[in-house]
Amino acid sequence: MPEYKFKNIMNHYPTIRISSSQMETEVLRILLKLGFQEKKARTCASVFTNNSLEGVLSHGVNRFPRFVNYILNDLIDVDAEPELGYSAGAIEQWDGKSGPGILNALKCTERAMELSKISGIGCVALANTNHWMRGGTYGWQAAKAGFVFIGWTNTIGNMPAWGALDNKLGNNPLVIAVPFGNEAIVLDMAMSQYSYGQMEKKTI
């Protein structure tokens, strides 16, 4: 981007710095106003804030207005609780009941870890949910608890297959995480050069 354009943008949209605690408090306030139970609201506010704080702006607070819009348009049920639909040993299928994707994904990651303690592996599928925001959140959740994690989601068809013209494939996020000492090594990537959220970030 040419320097003069950058300066012009900054003149119109000055940078405002706020603390992470202030950011999280404001997100929490809005979620409570939208009818979230306090525990659920605090969890979501923490995830949105940490995503931004850790540099993943494309899936942090930048996505929060859309999350609010989904709630206002009844696409997210703030009171929904995920429900087990099918179980076979180390495999489970859960119905997210159109609840917040963050909460549903955290729950299913926890279930996968519980299953792996029993069977050595846990495979959990989740349907009828909403955007889980940053996939790496759940990789960190599992790896820091001592588990290897592989996770992905489906999405709309917005990419053509190699050599084709029509959009048929989703730009699905893929997450692979392994424990590393007290931390973790986490791969969190899109299937293309950019995630949709990264492209959106450029327009802000």
Question: Where would I find each of the regions flagged by the language model?
Answer:
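N-terminal glycine-rich anion-binding loops that anchor highly charged ligand groups
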Residues: 16-23, 36-62, 76-87
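Active-site cofactor/substrate anionic-group-binding motifs, chiefly glycine-
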Residues: 60-113
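Long, hydrophobic, well-ordered secondary-structure blocks that form the structural core
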Residues: 129-161, 166-168
